[in-house]
Amino acid sequence: MTAPTAIRRLNAADPDFARHLDHLLSWESVSDDSVNQRVLDIIKAVRERGDAALVEFTQRFDGLQVASMADLILPRERLELALTRITVAQREALEKAAARVRSYHEKQKQDSWTYTEADGTVLGQKVTPLDRAGLYVPGGKASYPSSVLMNAIPAKVAGVTEVVMVVPTPRGEVNELVLAAACIAGVDRVFTIGGAQAVAALAYGTESVPQVDKVVGPGNIYVATAKRHVFGQVGIDMIAGPSEILVVCDGQTDPDWIAMDLFSQAEHDEDAQAILVSPDAEFLDKVAASIAKLLPTMERAEIINTSINGRGALIKVRDMQQAIEVANRIAPEHLELSVADPQAWLPQIRHAGAIFMGRHTSEALGDYCAGPNHVLPTSGTARFSSPLGVYDFQKRSSIIFCSEQGASELGRTASVLARGESLTAHARSAEYRIVDDQDQGQ
């Protein structure tokens, strides 16, 4: 039986509000020394023994009896088969979501550019896709096909040559929706491996698993810890914390809607965070009543209750202006502006992973099919981070072409600066290309 909900109530007018808010927002991962050491041992084993280590760890952690890596490779035909094993409605939903995600991300694609100066010097930027990206997908029955779309499609739009997906199949459990999503998203290769060992295989390569340039995708604490350790060998997307939603409401939205929006993140796990901010105290009471009324109807009521009681809050503010200030202080992963005129407040929002505008725009639409990416910065990192996008799978190279005149002119400036830093070879390298004015063009 679910315990009664006792969501925290805060008031921004209280003198110790800032301290209470900081305590509410604090979260530390549970990657302790033992987890860290186990991950390091796994990475070392994969680097040294390659496929053999992957087979051993898969047998140990996923409960599978496999003879070799050949048993852990899914051919393209298996992905296509998955499309026939899901319902027509599921396939249509995946295809519609994929089309919207693709359309949105195509607008993010950056192109190379150059400009030419008067003396013929050309400066610019060359935009190049990564050669190969690795996508980690959690396995088992609780896996998420939407994450496959959100991670793989931006990579393909960017022009990544090969997208390699790893997905564990604990006790042989294969999620057909995940494989169907991989087929629709254009994933090139799939290995049924998971955990820190899969991250290590992507980062360093084995006899069967190709080395990638970047590893993206969510996972448990072992996956997150492994991503930390391989960063530098490869790029990573981010180290994601628990899911978050912050709803700013003027008090005019149906309180049942708001309660369910809070549940939509709280149901992810016990550490997820759901916060409502409003200047209307009576409305906060109504939402609290809706939470109590609706919670018993939820399939994941225990998880929601633990999340709401442990990390949730209803925050009373002076007015909408202060609500926006609190939102910027929190820098949430998901921010709902459930107000009459969200466009009026949008310019003041500085820190948020995704902003959901208006009463009808539930966060769930963004999770699945609106188009923008649902891989978003958490734990306040929206202050300096962005959603996953096409730009995460592109890199930029500077282009510099100097004409004779340009090299001569720039050489004088470079010489002065280089000698000021006592780097004589730098200076002389530039000076060799300086020509007298009367010599230019001869």
From Swiss-Prot:
The active site is at E333 (proton acceptor), H334 (proton acceptor). One of its GO terms (molecular function) is NAD binding. It catalyses: L-histidinol + 2 NAD(+) + H2O = L-histidine + 2 NADH + 3 H(+). Pathway: Amino-acid biosynthesis; L-histidine biosynthesis; L-histidine from 5-phospho-alpha-D-ribose 1-diphosphate: step 9/9. Its EC number is 1.1.1.23. Zn(2+) binds at Q265, H268, D367, H426. SUPFAM superfamilies: ALDH-like (SSF53720). Coiled coil: none annotated. Keywords: Amino-acid biosynthesis, Histidine biosynthesis, Metal-binding, NAD, Oxidoreductase, Zinc. Pfam families: Histidinol_dh (PF00815). It comes from the Bacteria. Its cofactor is Zn(2+). One of its GO terms (cellular component) is cytosol. Disulfide bonds: none annotated. Gene3D superfamilies: 1.20.5.1300, Nitrogenase molybdenum iron protein domain. Binds 1 zinc ion per subunit. Substrate binds at S243, Q265, H268, H334, D367, E421, H426. HAMAP family: HisD (MF_01024). This is Histidinol dehydrogenase.
